[in-house]
Amino acid sequence: MADAAVIEKLEAGFKKLEAATDCKSLLKKYLTKEVFDKLKDKRTSLGATLLDVIQSGVENLDSGVGIYAPDAEAYTLFAPLFDPIIEDYHVGFKQTDKHPNKDFGDVNSFVNVDPEGKFVISTRVRCGRSLQGYPFNPCLTESQYKEMEAKVSSTLSSLEGELKGTYYPLTGMSKEVQQKLIDDHFLFKEGDRFLQAANACRYWPAGRGIYHNDNKTFLVWVNEEDHLRIISMQMGGDLGQVFRRLTSAVNEIEKRIPFSHHDRLGFLTFCPTNLGTTVRASVHIKLPKLAANREKLEEVAGKYNLQVRGTRGEHTEAEGGIYDISNKRRMGLTEFQAVKEMQDGILELIKIEKEM
């Protein structure tokens, strides 16, 4: 049972949402009085309540989604709120659907999407993972953060070959190392207001860190938004090489660290937008002719379920006609299918750009 003080805060938060007529978040759309009354006094075995789930969206009425999962159990206990939001965000993934098992497929079927090097500046594939047996950010204690960091850093330090590298803890990091990581665009900052309000940044920077290999093509963020963000990237358009590196890293790490997985939802993450495959495959790409015809660009992107963003990510402009283009779908399809869809879409965009 949630305690009286929590329920009081929840009631106030619900009133605030109800009164916010211009709020367009999925939280507002799906947290009906009926759902609210059903969930307000529930509590996970780790002590998380509905307040942990919705507080970021109550605080930030301009949220797109507005909810986070404080622990793995929250996805089941608070399913009457999570399920419709997941179905709405991950278009086509119905509440009766089951996410397929992990399948990287034939990684050799991925290619260099731009062998001439005229369009694609860089290619990146990332996935998120949570460690089994640990809650997500809002419920973690400082000692759990440190315990997880110790487990992860020792696992990463044992990687060999191309993945061999160095772990840099944020705690006690020297100014020189910090600057070097900023220059390489590797350093993550303390969370934005959405993550702050979700209590995702407690005990900062305890347990947080960055690992990268010697040639800076493989990167792991430890305890940023998710327990692990595993990233493979390089200049140019060789998606095959980037994806192969990612899959071999994930498979190596998984041998030593069990990940949080849900029968219906796939791999679990702090934010419900990343569930399922958790995979985001993206390129920074110059498409000057299509950039002048944004409608055509969006039309092709829509056909292949691609998301088009500005160069610096969400809500930014395309600097010098350079776009960040990635797969949109994360749920209800395999890792292989998600990356294949992105590859097909990018090849099509390049073909159209050449013909214009």
Swiss-Prot record:
Every Phosphagen kinase N-terminal domain range: 9-91
Keyword set includes Cell membrane: no
Cysteines engaged in disulfide bonds, as pairs: none
Positions annotated to bind ATP: 122-126, 185, 229, 280-284, 309-314
Assigned EC number: 2.7.3.3
Entry GO terms, CC: extracellular space
GO molecular function, one term: ATP binding
UniProt-listed GO biological process terms: dTDP metabolic process; phosphocreatine biosynthetic process
Tissue specificity note: Muscle (at protein level).
Residues spanning the membrane: none
Protein name as catalogued: Arginine kinase Lit v 2.0101
